[in-house]
Each structure stands twice: as C-alpha cells, then as structure tokens.
C-alpha cells in the first residue's frame, strides 16, 4: 500500500506541474507586452506554440505571468531546430544559438539584459569559425575577425562603439597580408596599402576624411611604379 501511495503522489505531482500549451492564434499581448489567452483575465503561464499554414510547428516559447520566461525555440519547416534562446521576465539573457538544418551550430550570440554582450561567433556549415566579434551593451566594441573556411584568418579590425577605429587588415588564404587601411570612427584616413600574394607592395592610396586624397601609386612585383594618379577629395586630378 505504501508503494502504491507513493506512486500516486508522483503521478499527481507530474500532472500538477505539467505545462499548459496553447496555440499562438489563441493568445494576444496587451499594450504593455503582457500575454493573455483569449477569454481569460489572468496573464498566461505555460507554453505558446506557433504553426504555419501547413500545420507545422514554427516556434514555441515559455511564459510566466504573461512574460516570456524560459526557453524560446524556432524550427525549420522540416521540424529541425533553427534557433533557441532564453528569456527572463521578457528579457533575453544567456547564449542564443542558431543552427543549420543539419543540426550544426551556425551562430552563438551571448545576451545580457536584452542586449548582445560578449564574444559572438558565426560558423561555416563545415563547423569552422567564420566570424568572431565582441559586443558591449548591444554594440560591437573590441574586435572583429573573419576566417576562410579552411580556418585561416581572412580579416581583422578594431571596433569602438560600433565603428571601425584603427588598422583594418585583409589576408590572402595563405596567410600573407593582402591589404591594410586605417579608420577613425568608420572614416578611412592615412595611406591604404595593398600587397601581392608574394608580400611585395602592390599599391598605395592616401585617404583623407574617407576619400582618396593625394598621389596614389601602383607597383609591379619588382617594385617599379607602373601607374601614378593624383586625387583631390575623392576625384582624380588631371
């Protein structure tokens, strides 16, 4: 008898704490963003599921007292997981993960108090890192790097308050420097230098306030000047 009573208690506990599930077309949000189910006056607690015209699940989210609280997931038409995120009191926190349809991670984006915060990573379908960037208070700040699908560095730049600030570099697949330029608050300044894959200088173009300004030179791989053009405020001077 004791075992039977324990079993009944466990079953009743599971039922008591099982989540309620309603379809999205039965729910609505008021002007404060609080979610209710049609015909009910109490803010909704449970899971809301959204379906497409074909009746396939598109997404679902967990709510508590009318606010997103817990996991939120989106799905591909195939039913495979596309994206997942965590919310607390309608505010996104933790790492959002997006997936390719084969299940491999496509994006990892950390959130804090509803804004991106920390190092975000985007991946190629083969699992190699594609882009890596740092965020502060919802804005890119720090650095951004991109990679070839082989894993070799493709580009790197410094970012301050959402704008490129400092030296920006682009690399060949073999790792050799292809180009370097300087920016100040997203505006290109100084001399941009382009290189042959051998490492020899290919071109020099001076910039001022985001526009070519001064004498630009192109070189062959022996170092000989093969072209020289003068610019003023972005326009070629003839």
Residue ranges and their predicted role:
Residues 14-238:
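Glycine/tyrosine- and acidic-biased, solvent-exposed loop/turn segments at the edges of beta-strands
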Residues 4-12:
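Sec-dependent N-terminal signal peptides
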């Amino acid at each position: 008898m004791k075992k039977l009573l324990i079993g009944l208690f466990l079953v009743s506990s599971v039922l008591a704490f099982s989540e309620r599930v309603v379809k999205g077309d039965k729910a609505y949000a008021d002007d404060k963003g609080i979610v209710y189910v049609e015909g009910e006056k109490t803010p909704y607690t449970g899971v809301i599921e959204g379906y497409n015209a074909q009746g396939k699940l598109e997404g679902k989210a967990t709510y508590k007292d009318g606010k997103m609280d817990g996991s939120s997931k989106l799905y591909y038409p195939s039913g495979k997981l596309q994206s997942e995120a965590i919310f607390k009191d309608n505010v996104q926190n933790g790492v959002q993960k997006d997936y390719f349809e084969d299940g491999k991670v496509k994006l990892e984006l950390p959130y804090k108090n509803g804004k991106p915060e920390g190092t975000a990573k985007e991946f190629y379908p083969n699992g190699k890192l594609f882009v890596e960037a740092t965020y502060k208070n919802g804005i890119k700040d720090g650095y951004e790097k991109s990679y070839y699908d082989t894993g070799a560095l493709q580009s790197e730049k410094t970012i301050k308050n959402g704008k490129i600030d400092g030296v920006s570099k682009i690399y060949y697949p073999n790792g050799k420097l292809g180009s370097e330029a300087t920016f100040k608050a997203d505006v290109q300044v100084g001399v941009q230098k382009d290189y042959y894959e051998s490492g020899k200088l290919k071109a020099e173009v001076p910039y001022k306030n985001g526009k070519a300004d001064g004498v630009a030179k192109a070189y062959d791989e022996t170092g000989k000047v093969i072209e020289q053009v003068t610019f003023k405020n972005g326009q070629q001077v003839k």
